[in-house]
């Protein structure tokens, strides 16, 4: 009669047997994972900050949002470059849970980590990019696709450089303050804070002498 493995191990030693198992973490790409984690944490923080700013009843100044958006875009570029730098390492890494990992309570996390296909949102983005670009990847060679991508990178770099040069020629914050200062100097038609004095009105009606308005009070001009 065959016996189970558990029955061959004394009950007192079963727990120690599991604890004595040592795992080799030398193959874990710690540097790559930590670099990606830091970049993603920074990007998530910036996106959350933009979301909070846009959720306020009163929006901040436009140049504040633009500054935060520039920071977010630079962090997005940093994430992309980091993923490209460690692409070979991450593509060859196999993810699997350890025996002590709580797979029951974190089933969704395990499913996400072990997922082989793109999530539906990513597939929709990739489909949209293909349709927008008008390039049929199935009919092109890898060299031709790489050439098109290189042309796109060159155009992107040119646009980024041109925008940076033009942006440096203007001081938007000072222009905003100057425009507000000029607007405050404009003459506006407004009602006086206090009505005309009755005596001044009667005097103007009788003699035609126009009263002089100084601030919120009105006094009659003297001959």
Curated annotation (Swiss-Prot):
Superkingdom field: Eukaryota
Gene Ontology CC annotations of this record: core mediator complex; mediator complex; nucleus
Gene3D superfamilies per record: 1.20.58.1710, 6.10.250.2610
Keyword annotations: Activator, Coiled coil, DNA-binding, Nucleus, Transcription, Transcription regulation
Coiled coil: 33-59
Signal sequence bounds: none
Residues annotated as transmembrane: none
Gene Ontology biological-process entries: negative regulation of transcription by RNA polymerase II; positive regulation of transcription by RNA polymerase II; positive regulation of transcription elongation by RNA polymerase II; positive regulation of transcription initiation by RNA polymerase II; regulation of transcription by RNA polymerase II; RNA polymerase II preinitiation complex assembly
Main location: nucleus
Residue segments, region Interaction with TBP1: 2-138
UniProt GO MF annotations: protein-macromolecule adaptor activity; RNA polymerase II cis-regulatory region sequence-specific DNA binding; TBP-class protein binding; transcription coregulator activity; transcription corepressor activity
UniProt miscellaneous comment: Present with 937 molecules/cell in log phase SD medium.
Assembly notes: Component of the Mediator complex, which is composed of at least 21 subunits that form three structurally distinct submodules. The Mediator head module contains MED6, MED8, MED11, SRB4/MED17, SRB5/MED18, ROX3/MED19, SRB2/MED20 and SRB6/MED22, the middle module contains MED1, MED4, NUT1/MED5, MED7, CSE2/MED9, NUT2/MED10, SRB7/MED21 and SOH1/MED31, and the tail module contains MED2, PGD1/MED3, RGR1/MED14, GAL11/MED15 and SIN4/MED16. The head and the middle modules interact directly with RNA polymerase II, whereas the elongated tail module interacts with gene-specific regulatory proteins.
Its job: Component of the Mediator complex, a coactivator involved in the regulated transcription of nearly all RNA polymerase II-dependent genes. Mediator functions as a bridge to convey information from gene-specific regulatory proteins to the basal RNA polymerase II transcription machinery. The Mediator complex, having a compact conformation in its free form, is recruited to promoters by direct interactions with regulatory proteins and serves for the assembly of a functional preinitiation complex with RNA polymerase II and the general transcription factors.
Family membership: Belongs to the Mediator complex subunit 8 family.
Protein name: Mediator of RNA polymerase II transcription subunit 8
């Amino acid at each position: 009669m065959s016996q189970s493995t558990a029955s061959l191990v004394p009950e007192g030693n079963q727990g120690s047997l599991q604890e004595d198992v040592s795992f080799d973490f030398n193959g874990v790409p710690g540097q790559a994972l930590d670099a990606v984690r830091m970049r993603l944490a920074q990007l998530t923080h910036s996106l959350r900050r933009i979301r909070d700013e846009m959720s306020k009843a009163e929006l901040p100044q436009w140049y504040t949002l633009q500054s935060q958006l520039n920071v977010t875009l630079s962090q997005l570029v940093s994430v992309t470059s980091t993923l490209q730098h460690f692409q070979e390492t991450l593509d060859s890494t196999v993810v699997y849970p350890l025996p002590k990992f709580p797979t029951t309570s974190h089933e969704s996390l395990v499913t996400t980590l072990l997922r082989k296909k793109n999530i539906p949102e990513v597939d929709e983005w990739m489909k949209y990019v293909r349709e927008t670009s008008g390039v049929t990847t199935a009919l092109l060679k890898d060299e031709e696709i790489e050439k098109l991508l290189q042309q796109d990178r060159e155009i992107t770099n040119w646009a980024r450089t041109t925008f940076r040069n033009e942006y440096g020629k203007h001081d938007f914050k000072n222009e905003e303050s100057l425009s507000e200062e000029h607007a405050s100097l404009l003459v506006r038609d407004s009602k006086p804070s206090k009505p005309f004095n009755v005596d001044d009105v009667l005097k103007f009606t009788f003699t035609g002498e126009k009263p002089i308005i100084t601030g919120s009070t009105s006094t009659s001009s003297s001959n």
